[in-house]
């Protein structure tokens, strides 16, 4: 059961990590709610071992609309749209490991970037008829669509060193590459 407001109501929230907005409205046999949220974790990700420019962003919108022309019939719609975007431009990483007497250093310098996008749309329309207080029949039409894209080309050059001496234990390079795409659509109709 979703919240149905009795009158106009609204709220706003904001922080360094994002913002949100909610609006609800009702008049006689009609009600609707809408919500929007935006969030970014960009400022929290600066403490990770891999240094670079992190830019994750999340945006979503939800709605619930209800209309009841009389006590027996109701028409309801619920919907959601979301877009999550993750961009990453790595620059370097350094990790120290080992024992107190035998500390090693692993350093990596990067070229390239990662760009990911996840977009989702969902909606359901419901037409319901109550025959009695205990008998209700509903026709539900729903649709879901998603589009996902993960793409990156990141090359890293690495060095493994003894930290107590100038001895170099190893050097190397590697390449990570991906082009992952997913498009999915689903529709359903049920009683």
Residue ranges and their predicted role:
Residues 44-49:
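Hydrophobic alpha-helical membrane segments
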């Amino acid at each position: 059961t979703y919240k149905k407001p009795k009158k106009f109501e609204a709220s706003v929230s904001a922080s360094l990590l994002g913002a949100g907005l909610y609006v609800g409205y009702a008049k006689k046999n009609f009600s609707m709610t809408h919500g929007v949220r935006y969030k970014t974790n960009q400022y929290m990700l600066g403490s990770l071992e891999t240094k670079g420019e992190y830019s994750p962003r999340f945006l979503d919108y939800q709605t619930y609309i209800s209309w009841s022309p009389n006590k027996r019939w109701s028409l309801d719609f619920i919907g959601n749209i979301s877009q999550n975007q993750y961009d990453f431009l790595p620059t370097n990483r350094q990790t120290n490991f080992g024992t107190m007497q035998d500390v090693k250093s692993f350093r990596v310098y990067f070229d390239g970037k990662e760009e990911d996008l996840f977009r989702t749309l969902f909606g359901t329309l419901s037409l319901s008829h109550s025959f009695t207080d205990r008998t209700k029949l509903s026709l539900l039409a729903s649709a879901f669509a998603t589009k996902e894209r993960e793409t990156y080309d990141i090359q890293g050059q690495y060095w493994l060193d003894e930290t107590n001496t100038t001895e170099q234990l190893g050097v190397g390079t590697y390449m990570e590459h991906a082009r992952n795409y997913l498009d999915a659509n689903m529709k359903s109709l049920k009683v």
